[in-house]
Structures are given as structure tokens and as C-alpha cells.
């Protein structure tokens, strides 16, 4: 969604993912150079591979060292870098932090790993530039209001938008 909007604005985005448990996670690599897919789904990991299929003109890179991936993305012509699951990654400067909140389990049992699903405590939400409520079409108005109240506690003026999943 964000990459598509950037493309419409004339930007050249690239997506950088860790590629967790993929064949390329440790050494890193280019899944797609924005022209063709260069590795298998097993090497890329499921999500990066699906992103490369869905966004054929957008470079997709994976690897634990996201600084290396970022440099490769810029070398491929990217002028905007989108980090998949990058909120808690501090190795790169950023202009915006967009946090996705799943309306079906919005706050990961309110605890960080291993007790809950959060990568950081909820107080980290104060750094967010934008909240996107995913699957908001499946949540009731009352559920969305509860989520927004929690988000307002941490990001008082941070914009909150709803999104819906579609095939």
C-alpha cells in the first residue's frame, strides 16, 4: 500500500526486510531488483517474496544487516526506504515511523516478548509518526475506539488511519 502510493507520487521506493529464518537472513541479498525476482521463495522468505510478486517494480532486499541492505537499495536507484518490521531497529536514521496495529490482537497481550507479542514496551508508541489499524473492517466501532484510546495515551496527536485486508 505505502510503496504503491510512493510510486504514484513519482518516488522510487525499496523494501528492506530482515527475512527472518530465510536462506538469506544472515548473508543478505536482493530478492527483487525492481525488474525481476532473483531468488527462490525459500531463500527470500515468504513475506519478502510475496512483496516482490505484488510490487514488481519495487526492489525488495533481505538481511539481518539492514544498513548493508539500505546501501544496496540506494545503489539500485531507491530514493525512499521502507523497513518491514523496522520500528525497533535503530541502525538507520528515519524520517517517519509508521506502526501497524492489528485490530484482532492490537497490543500483543500488553507485554513484550517472550511474555507477549510486543517487540518493545507500549511506551515506545510515543515515537510513532502514524498508526495504521490493520483489519479495521473486521473490528467493531467499540473495539476500534478502545484501541484508539490506548494509542492516544502514548501518541496524543499521532494520526490514526484504518486499513482493510483484501486479496
PLM region spans:
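Beta-strand-loop-alpha "switch" segments that mediate conformational coupling across diverse proteins
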Residues: 160-167
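Phosphate/Mg2+-binding loops and adjacent switch elements
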Residues: 11, 20-155, 162
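A conserved segment at the C-terminal end of the G1
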Residues: 1-16, 20
Amino acid at each position: 500500500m505505502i510503496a504503491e502510493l510512493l510510486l504514484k507520487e513519482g518516488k522510487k521506493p525499496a523494501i528492506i526486510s530482515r527475512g527472518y529464518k530465510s536462506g538469506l537472513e544472515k548473508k543478505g541479498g536482493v530478492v527483487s531488483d525492481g525488474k525481476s525476482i532473483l531468488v527462490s521463495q525459500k531463500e527470500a522468505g515468504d513475506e519478502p517474496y510475496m512483496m516482490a510478486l505484488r510490487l514488481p517494480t519495487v526492489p525488495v532486499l533481505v538481511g539481518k544487516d539492514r544498513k548493508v541492505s539500505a546501501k544496496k537499495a540506494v545503489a539500485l536507484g531507491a530514493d525512499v526506504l521502507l523497513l518491514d518490521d523496522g520500528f525497533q531497529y535503530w541502525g538507520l536514521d528515519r524520517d517517519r515511523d509508521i506502526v501497524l496495529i492489528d485490530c484482532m490482537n492490537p497490543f500483543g497481550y500488553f507485554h513484550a516478548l517472550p511474555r507477549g507479542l510486543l517487540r518493545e514496551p507500549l511506551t515506545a508508541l510515543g515515537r510513532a509518526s502514524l498508526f495504521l489499524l490493520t483489519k479495521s473492517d473486521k473490528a467493531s466501532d467499540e473495539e476500534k475506539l478502545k484501541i484508539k484510546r490506548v494509542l492516544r495515551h502514548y501518541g496524543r496527536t499521532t494520526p490514526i488511519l484504518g486499513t482493510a485486508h483484501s486479496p
